[in-house]
Amino acid sequence: MADCPYARCIQERRHIRRELLRWTKNMVFVVGLERVAEELMGRRRWKQYQDTLYSGTRSSESLTAQAHHRLYPAFSSSCDPVPGNLEQIGSRPLHPPASSTSLPATITTTTTTTTTTTATAAATATTTATGLIKQETLQRHHHLQNHHHHLQSTAVQDHHRPYQQQQQQQQRQQQRQEERRLRPDEIKVEVGEDEFANGGAARDESKAGSTDASTPATVTTTGATTTLPAASATGTGPATPSAVVATSNATAAMTTGTTTIPTRRLRKRRQNDGEGADDRDDDEENEEEEDGRGQSEAEKRLKLDEDADGAVSPLRREKDRGSREYPTSNATDTDGTKERTEEVALDRTPVTQGLLRVKKEEELQEAPSCGGGPTILTTPGLDSDGIRLPCREVEAAATARNVVAPFLIGSRRTSPPPEDWKPLDKCYFCLDGKLPHDDQPPLSPQSDSSSSSRSAESPMSVQVDPMAASVVAAALTGTYPTLLPQWCLPPREAPLVGVQPHQDSATPADQPLDLSAKPKNSQDNNISLLEQQKIPLRMTAGIDPKSIFNSGYRPKPRMSGPVAAVAAAAVAAAGVGGVPVVGAGGGRRAYTEEELQAALRDIQSGKLGTRRAAVIYGIPRSTLRNKVYKLAMERERDASLSSTHSHPHEPGAPATTITTITTTTTTTTTTTTTTTTPNTTQNASATTPPPQVDEVDDKELSGAEEEKEVEKALLKPLLSLEDLVRFSTLEGSGGDSLRTLLQRGQETGAEWPGLEHANIGPYIQKMIAAAAPFKGMETQDYRIPEVMRRLMSEDKRLSKSVNGDQSQPPHQQLHHHQSTHPQAQAQAQPQQQQQQQQQQPQQQQQQQQQQQQQQRGPMTNDDFNPNIEEEASDSAQGRAILKIPSYKPASTPGCSSKNGEPTSAAFAQGFATAASSPGLLERASPAFSGTSSPTNSLVGKTVAVNFRDVIAKSISVKFQEGQTVSGGGMGGCQPGGVVQSQQPIMTDPSPFKRGRYTPPQPANAQQGQAQAQAKPQSQEANKPKPATGGKGTRPKRGKYRNYDRDSLVEAVRAVQRGEMSVHRAGSYYGVPHSTLEYKVKERHLMRPRKRDQKQSDDKTKETSTVTAAAAATNIRPGTADNKPQLKPQKPFTSPGGIPGPNGIKMPSFMEGMPHLPFTPFNFWNPPPFMPSPFMAGAPNVPTILPEQYFATSRIRGLQEQQRNAAMVQQQQQQQQQQQQQQQQQQQQQQQQQHQAREREGVGAGIAETSAGTSNSRGAAQMSKVPRDVSEGIYDGSGANGSFLDNLIRSSLETGIPRDQRAMTEARNQQQQASSQQQIPESMRSKALIDQLCRNSRRTPVPRLAQDSSEDESYRGPSASGGRPVPERPERVPTVDLSPSPSDRGRNDDGSDRLTSPPTPLSISRAGSRDEDSTRDSTKLDRSSREREVHNGGQQEDRDRKTLTSAPQQPQQQQQQQQQQQQQQQQLNHYPDLHNLYAVPTDKKSACDSKLIVDHSSQKTQQQQPQQQQQQQQQQQPQQQSQQPQQQQPQPQQQQQQQQQQQPQQQQKEYGAVSGLVVQLQRGYNSGNNRSGEQANSQQQQQQQSGEPVIGMEDSVEQ
């Protein structure tokens, strides 16, 4: 099968498909690559056979020099346009040279081209025993990398200039073959001129004869297509026709080698030779060889380089010559040549690696330049025409010709026609699963892990050749958008670029991260491998190929481990095939360690089964299974140890850490390279670093490959950055939304429970790699890259924590990373922030990671933060595939107390908390970040280890304690109900899988949180059994009920969303696919949802009441609050924040907050990151905000409409009553709030972000009765209904604090916090319809007007202290965020909000970046709402203008707002987070329009209540200064203020959730002060005119 090109091609196709699936979910691209692979396979086989036939048949046909020249003119004509266009050079010049490839100068051409390119050196080494040419070739190759453009233009000029001369000279050369050392220009021109003179007939003849001469010439032509005249001259008199024929054949071979050259060449050849198959093959070959053959050519160059470097010995030259000759025989089949060349390349892979990469880019740019990949593509592209050969190369080629030409001619065999697959002499399975020429990853994972020496040698070119070449071509072409870059990289441009420069500087020689530097091209994100290939091509100009070699080699060591690293280093040092072709696997093994690791990664990630992996990677299935189980057992054992104490996060934390550190130097480097740079290195199997990471994670996670697959799917999950980016892209404001999400994630602590670091790390690294082109733009302004880095750092820390290195305090490491060079900074900042969240345990993890990185010396640059962060995950994962520091189910830090080990559910919950409310997490930092810091570190770290731990060991404990802890223990665990509730959420996610998969769990946990807690013990019984033990971990057949309903729900949703097939979802979520098939149908899914929701509803109502009571008792939900919260959040847990990435689970959204972090990922509209809801209204806010956040605009709209119909009357009545009560309360509250805000200036923010004060809780309870009624009316399912009602009501009724009447006293102290909580619960019954019927609520437009004036007076009392005001502005943005995602996005700025639902509001709030800006943002919201109401979408600009130009309100308000901002920032720590991630003004300006627009749209959709509250908040300072201006009755003002306070509180929480928003807000401080003033004046108008215009129903409809 190995010798069968078809089998090899099939494997290549599989590999391509696998890598494409890994790297991109872009089916178009996948299909394209698959088609390319198929065509390549077919073409290769046909080309090899036909080339052999043609070379054998036509080798006898000697074309005259004129015929050869005729061939050349076509090339020459093609080459003429080439100089201007590298791509043309790659395509057009290659084609003409392909037709007239100077195979007449077959040997000389080969030598010249080889000299020109690596192939020149290879040909020289092959034909000539001179090592000088080899060195020259390598040197020239490097020079060409840097100067190929220059050479190309020079060669083109020379080509045009000497055409006539060269025609004559070529004729003379053919006559006098010894005078082969014509100037490259002359040689090329001569060929071109002859071709021009002798048009197509000679070309046909040349083709006919060229095939014959092509055998000898193919070797040479592959090496040097440019030296056509030289080849002609080289060919002795008798050989001149032969040489011409060889030139034709060389052209054909070059065509094969070069994508573009092959096309024309093959077309002409088809015309001349009637090669219909070649026509098809070459057309596609041009497509694929542009990609695949560009790489094939690169690989040919590799082989030629190997010939030059490694084949110095005559025997080797002979062998190489045979190889080349054989490909020449397959003149058209560059693949044959490539395989030959690769055969040589295997020997020379180390040297070729850099050359290959460089040339690949050249090939990609100029790939067509010369079919013989070795030719420098820029000049060689012309070289194939005889134009392109640079002078040095020509000289070297001439030398090679003179020395080698006779030898080659004498020894050049008329391509042994039927000698089908000489390159395949060793089956790819035998050759470490790689064909010598098939090193190219397309062969299959072999290339990835096949021979570590080989991967190290040419990780990019060898591994990725066919598919990677196609991908690279596509990337270069921009065929498919870079998956991550476009989505995630709006912010990535600056920060990722910032990371990239370090990558670039360090990667060139040192690091596997060189691949990362290579993927710097934006397209690189899609296919790291291809990117690496392509980027080295692009980077080669800047990066020395040798550096690339080194970096390429390093990734290899990582792949092969320390031995591989040594071998790779040796190879890099030798520059020749220092690593045996067999690879690191060893002579006795047909597979390399790298392949084994790649296979294990695939298996663990669930990408492959052991059976398929065994076939693909050529590794015995028994070996794979043994390794997988061994890893799983080790992981579980270590996880058990880790679960024993939540600190050791990974199974073999210390021991494995040392091993991993060593392996990390090699394997981690490999993994990092695999993830980022190594993607190229692990092209075939590691083409998708995330899969590798996931594979590694799965290994860690599960002992059973099946379970591993599920685990990987789950780990992969939730929201892979790809999904996140994809949704962000779909959102339209992908950058902002993703930025907000990621930044909030940073605030959260950088470890996103929902995001698998294994997934995110590779994805982030892809992002960073894609941002590499922007590395010059490095700024930490873009916090997404920082967050991404932090995610990667989190993985690193997880690895470190697993390794047990948790020494540095978070801030120390934070500062250490920040103070460290940007690379370390990029690494460190994510780690810093994560560590800030995770604090010392993760700080220690980070330190250990840093130590590991230091230990990985070469990986310092490899440790390029994204890479290293990913490397942290990969390093933990890649070091030992066993180790997957992706998220083990670490309980939230607070919930770490559950089992002492974080559960994936806890982790997801923690992340939900962190993501949901960064500020609150900061506030809860002691409990969530601080208390949970070990757990949070575990959250990231233990997720991999604890997936197994928690599932095997802790699942029982978790579910036992989880029920207890999540029921009541969580309260103790968490500082507030927020973290605690999240912990239960996380708890369920951990159990919901076989126990291994935390990430998907949160979604499942969200739906089944209540169930999960109800059935934790049953799950304990079930899951520990599958999870515990190496072999016991694999779920046994027949344990069909062993899956969590949450997992089932999540799987069903994933299938329904079209994210996965039933089978994949079944394995991914660990549920039987047969069951899943039935459940996928809506009716089946609805039943579990209803049950989950009913449980959630019951618990939510329960919890709302209990939480309200607890809130009344505790400012932050205490244990009692947490317990209710947990129950309300059990619905949240059902969604399980993590599943969001897989797809937003609407029911899960409704059911539980934990899904939020992922929901924002999925839908940037809902992304008003659940954090604030959790943070602010522990039980109530989470209940309310989850609806707002989780309920997509659609769901919210539908539910709101339903509730509208049912509750309009009730709400209106309640609104009237509440308004009256609120007016009274607000009057009282204005006084009380003034005092309370002064008191709460410091504490109110905390109280607000806490579950609200006890009064707010009490009010929430009181209002929950109507809420329960409305829930009963609206949603029998409770979880969805109650949460949606709460969310919708809170978002809709943010302006209508019905609870305020009950909370009059509570509001004095807690108005903001209680607004959020009270409104959610009390508004649930009334406010929902009132908000839905915002018109009724907006109907009191005077309120808005009053709000404008009263907001000040309302704020006046509270803002008099100046502290309450800051709290509210903080919330204002938060409010905008929370309602805006649900309301504004749908109603007013559906598009904007959809674009960046959480970010826009927070960014509109961010637009008024300060707390001043926040209050101003409320003003802006009003003004923008008003404008939007009046002007539609133009209010954005007006709002901005208002911000900038119309400071109509007293600066007193601004100052008060600023004070409020400062105070709130202090209180919330969320502003501090923002300070940590301060967004520069540029970013603000960049986000301003979108943010403001979103803000206005959100405000409009939130509509007047939020605006009123915001205005009140904003205007409270104004009111303080302008109380005389207050013309509206205070009761209404108070009501409005309360209403505004609720949204503000929510917004404040959202602001805490969305650090980015706060950052933007801070950035917008100055602008927002103005805008706040202006907005106040305008907001009054808006209140009057705009408020009634847009109603909640409008937002619901939208």
From Swiss-Prot:
Where the record puts its DNA-binding region(s)? 610-630, 1062-1082
List, alphabetically, the InterPro entries matched: Homeodomain-like_sf, HTH_Psq
Polar residues: compositionally biased ranges: 1562-1577
Could you list this entry's UniProt keywords, alphabetically sorted: Activator, DNA-binding, Nucleus, Phosphoprotein, Repeat, Transcription, Transcription regulation
Annotated HTH psq-type domain residues: 582-634, 1034-1086
For this UniProt entry, the molecular function terms from Gene Ontology, in alphabetical order, are:
sequence-specific DNA binding
Comp. bias regions, Basic residues: 140-151
Q: Where in the cell is it found?
A: Nucleus
Specify where the region named Disordered lies, as residue ranges. 83-105, 140-387, 436-462, 495-525, 636-705, 797-877, 962-1045, 1082-1145, 1248-1283, 1301-1598
Q: Where is the composition biased (Acidic residues)?
A: 275-291, 694-705
Q: In which tissues is it expressed?
A: Large-type Kenyon cells of mushroom body.
The GO biological-process annotations, alphabetized, read as: memory; positive regulation of DNA-templated transcription; regulation of transcription by RNA polymerase II
> Any one cellular component term from GO for this entry?
nucleus
Report biased composition (Basic and acidic residues) as residue ranges.
175-191, 292-305, 315-324, 335-346, 1093-1102, 1383-1392, 1407-1442, 1481-1497
> Which residues fall in a compositionally biased region of kind Low complexity?
164-174, 210-263, 445-461, 653-687, 820-855, 1003-1021, 1103-1120, 1309-1318, 1447-1466, 1501-1547
Segments of skewed composition (Gly residues): 965-975
Q: How does it assemble?
A: Homodimer.
Domain comment from the record reads as follows: The second H-T-H motif is necessary for transcriptional activation.
Q: What does this protein do?
A: Transcriptional activator which binds to the consensus sequence 5'-CCCTATCGATCGATCTCTACCT-3'. May play a role in higher-order sensory processing.
Q: What is this protein called?
A: Mushroom body large-type Kenyon cell-specific protein 1
Record organism: Apis mellifera
